[in-house]
Amino acid sequence: MDPAIILFVFIFVSVCFCLLIFLSAYRVFSGGSERNEYSFLGSEILGSEVPREFLNDEEALNHLASEYDFTHLSPEEQFSYLRGEEFTKTNPPNFHNTRGKSYSNEDDMLLKERGINAFEFEQDADILRGRYIVADKTEINFHNNDTPYSTATSILNYSLPVKNRAYSDTVYFEVKVFEFQNGSENPNGHFAIGLVTKPYPSDFRLPGYNNFSIAYESTGNLKINKPFPTPLQQHQGDNSQYNALVLPPLQQSDIVGFGYVVSTGTLFITRNGKKVMDVMRGCFIDLYPAVGCFSSNAKFQVNLGQLGFVWIEANVRKYGFVSNSDYKKIKGEQGLAALPEYGNSSVAEGDKLLEMGEELPPRYPEDELDFFGRSSKDILKVGSSSKSQNKTKSFSNNEKQDLEEINGEPKVAEEHRSSLITDDPEEVMDLRERLYEQNITGPVSELSSERAPLIGNNESQSEFYVNAKSATSSREGNTETDLKQVTDEEPNSSQELTKAAQNDSNISKTSRTKKKKKNKKNSKKNKKK
């Protein structure tokens, strides 16, 4: 081999080896040296992404118990603490549900269909002695929770929606303290607003007291997985050493907001429309909004994005759970698709639903018949445009039969129908009306006067019906010719109109006499047979 190649390979391997040694030394001596930086639990510890600093082991809990004088607590508070620790051991938090893994496929489909209406706070499990009621999905009313040591917490049914938020990487919600009595009447009244993991002992613990949870308490304390100080320890007056007062105390009409940045796992708190502080970073577990009360009745209203936020930045950047108004800001599979904007022409051009409306015009019902037994399609008014005259549509056979049954007319060819109506004088219109009535009622009265033979052969009956049909056809022909003559000549005097009427009556009399003669001959033939 060429010695130059061997030398090049040796130099390359030595450089790579030196780089590996340098990187390993940097990770050992420099990694995580900053005290303010949060470290993460690796796969060897619970396999989750939770800040190690806020997790309490048994040694830390014993230290907290001794620090806050656990032995001098009331029996109820001691029992609540021991019961909470037992619940955590038997039902540990599911730290594997990270970055939206708590959502199943069915949950994702439900959020697509219902949007923000899919979120609601869970009702109290004890229906008979319920301590709170959830109204309108996001209004929580604690009404039977004013007894000593009574504790209850309501949790949202779904965790924070952190998936498929490409353009809005922050989830935010606000809670308004609608009603809360605090003072001499209720000195131990206490509530907490925050985030918890499931399962959580909501029947007897407030948010922030068990792993893993965080809460903003009404006394101003910030609780992160710490069972101490207890609520009663925080109500020992202004000189109490347990009131840290990290945050401003909460009262009625205050609005508390919690935000979560999906990309960095940062949790922050707002109060009355102003950002207060960032609580932690690097928390990627699925958290559920929760509201709890201790020995007090209160009413809370939670805003998940269905209304405008008090914190203006959340409105501008669309930090709500699911955006219904601006789907483009929160792109992805979750959320409701925006309805077509009918007022915007640029949007309507590319909308397939609106384009189909032009291709498929609606079918309106047929117009009603006028006094003369014709629809508006058969009438051609003088002065109408040529376009409207050309727009004539043929009726189907069923429609023709229905019209003929309604009018009581026999079938007449459409060529013989008069479709032109002009501004004729009243005398001509009266004549038209009389002729039309005679045309309708005449054949019926004649046929009814000449009854069909009750007893006879089939030939005699057929001859009778043939004669009746010929009589009606001749009658129709005569009346139509007379009507055409009247409309063409347009008589200007009443004398001409009376003459036309007399001629018509004479014609009808002659036709009747002819029919009677024919019928008599036919009856004589039948008798001879």
UniProtKB/Swiss-Prot annotation:
Q: Which residues lie on this side of the membrane: Lumenal?
A: 24-529
Which cellular component, as a GO term, is one annotated location?
vacuolar membrane
Q: Where is the signal peptide?
A: none
Bias (Polar residues): 383-398, 457-476, 492-504
Quote the biased-composition stretches of kind Basic residues, using this chain's numbering: 511-529
User: CDD domains in the record, alphabetically?
Assistant: SPRY_SSH4_like
> Where in or outside the cell is it found?
Vacuole membrane; Endosome membrane
Membrane topology is: Single-pass type II membrane protein
Report the transmembrane regions from the record. Answer: 3-23
Entries under InterPro entries matching the protein: B30.2/SPRY, B30.2/SPRY_sf, ConA-like_dom_sf, SPRY_dom, SPRY_Ssh4-like
Glycosylation site residues = N157, N182, N211, N344, N390, N439, N458, N492, N503, N506
What's its job?
Answer: Components of the endosome-vacuole trafficking pathway that regulates nutrient transport. May be involved in processes which determine whether plasma membrane proteins are degraded or routed to the plasma membrane.
Its name, as the record gives it, is Protein SSH4
Give the taxonomic lineage as stored in the record: Eukaryota, Fungi, Dikarya, Ascomycota, Saccharomycotina
Gene (UniProt): SSH4
